[in-house]
Amino acid sequence: MSHNAFITEETIEPTDDGPLDGVTVAVKDNISTDGVRTTCGSEMLADYVPPYDATVVERLRDAGATIVGKTNMDEFGMGTTTETSAFGPTENPAAEGRVPGGSSGGSAAAVAAGDADLALGSDTGGSVRCPAAFCGVVGIKPTYGLVSRYGLVAYANSLEQIGPLAPTVEEAAELLDVIAGVDERDGTTREPPAGQPTYADAADGDVDGLTVGIPTELVDGADEGVRETFDDAVETLESAGATTQEVSLPSVETAVQAYYVIAMSEASSNLARFDGVRYGASGDEDGNWNESFAAAREAGFGEEVKRRILLGTYALSAGYHDKYYKQAQDARAWVKQDFDEAFESVDVLASPTMPVPPFERGESLEDPLKMYLADANTVPVNLANLPAISVPAGETADGPVGLQLVGPAFGEATLIRAGSALN
């Protein structure tokens, strides 16, 4: 194992034979594994050992997969670089000296380095797609409700989904086939429309007649090298039979602001349970609960997590709820409306996954706003609860570039078909 991709290296054997016999899978360390610690990349949960498997872990093991460890991540999923982990930063196997993306950077690095055949990550605002792009692998963010979140340690419930990372589109699709489906323990899961092929069967590269929309707002601000690589990939789709047309999504100009208000607000609520009593390391302040809670959270949380909790609490506080949180939800509805209107004239939307190549290590920690703004192309998808895939599009001098394809709800098969034309 290499690149500090893993927090815990431990073999979890399969419980049955199935389509993933002999396949090794790395699991992000915010997904519960029975008897194996699940830290969320945080000192707060450094010794937490779940007494149960997440639904996706059960399905992996039932399908014959061997889990090889729990992967490094930005603390509680809050980051774009996998540098906020309490267990040290992960290195990018595909771009020396640069970050692997986040927050599922350990999962992407494990696949890129060959430490695991496949991996699971979670995507709240791009946390599967960003590291997939930066590490030159494939990552899928499923439609909200396609994959069970039971056993996922919550950051922002209304936004996040568990998704696969793999070297190829077909392998990512095979993993999605295993983990997708209704779960009675997660009331948000839904059945996709009947009559669809398996996701693996959809990876046939047939894009003849497919209409691809290019949102100008998600392309115009991209780094020059990223834009050139993206344009070349679009030409590949066109040569395979797809047609392209420009579309406009004016609402995405507000998406980053809306996303961070909503995500931080949900985080401030979800992370309230980590107080050293119910969950997390004790504050050891005898006789004074307030001081004990404060000491536990001061010692247990890193700076980025504290920042987001404070901002989220502020956005929900009396007198500011309507000014921030309600306006963010209104912006979210506008984003969804724009996507719905776009899909009336195109089958999928294409953009660079990330508008920039991989950051140099340490670069974004000095400027958190820069890290937030880098999510501009990915967060609108989570706000609209839509599926997306990041596929390697090529490389610049600074590292890999991903192409993101977005589809209507439960349109994963179409995304996989289009993505496989590039992969």
From Swiss-Prot:
Biased composition (Acidic residues): 10-19
Classification via Gene3D superfamilies: Amidase signature (AS) domain
Keyword S-adenosyl-L-methionine: no
Primary enzyme class: ligase
NCBIfam families reported for this sequence: gatA
High-level lineage: Archaea, Methanobacteriati, Methanobacteriota, Stenosarchaea group, Halobacteria
Record-linked SUPFAM superfamilies: Amidase signature (AS) enzymes
GO biological process: translation
Function: Allows the formation of correctly charged Gln-tRNA(Gln) through the transamidation of misacylated Glu-tRNA(Gln) in organisms which lack glutaminyl-tRNA synthetase. The reaction takes place in the presence of glutamine and ATP through an activated gamma-phospho-Glu-tRNA(Gln).
Domain of life, per lineage: Archaea
Organism: Natronomonas pharaonis (strain ATCC 35678 / DSM 2160 / CIP 103997 / JCM 8858 / NBRC 14720 / NCIMB 2260 / Gabara)
Protein name per Swiss-Prot or TrEMBL: Glutamyl-tRNA(Gln) amidotransferase subunit A
Keywords: ATP-binding, Ligase, Nucleotide-binding, Protein biosynthesis
Segments of this protein annotated with the region Disordered: 1-20, 75-108, 183-206
Catalytic residues (positions): 28, 103, 127
Similarity annotation: Belongs to the amidase family. GatA subfamily.
Gene Ontology cellular-component terms listed: glutamyl-tRNA(Gln) amidotransferase complex
Keyword ATP-binding: yes
Catalytic reaction(s) noted: L-glutamyl-tRNA(Gln) + L-glutamine + ATP + H2O = L-glutaminyl-tRNA(Gln) + L-glutamate + ADP + phosphate + H(+)
GO MF terms, alphabetically ordered: ATP binding; glutaminyl-tRNA synthase (glutamine-hydrolyzing) activity
Subunit details: Heterotrimer of A, B and C subunits.
Pfam families on file: Amidase
Its EC number(s): 6.3.5.7
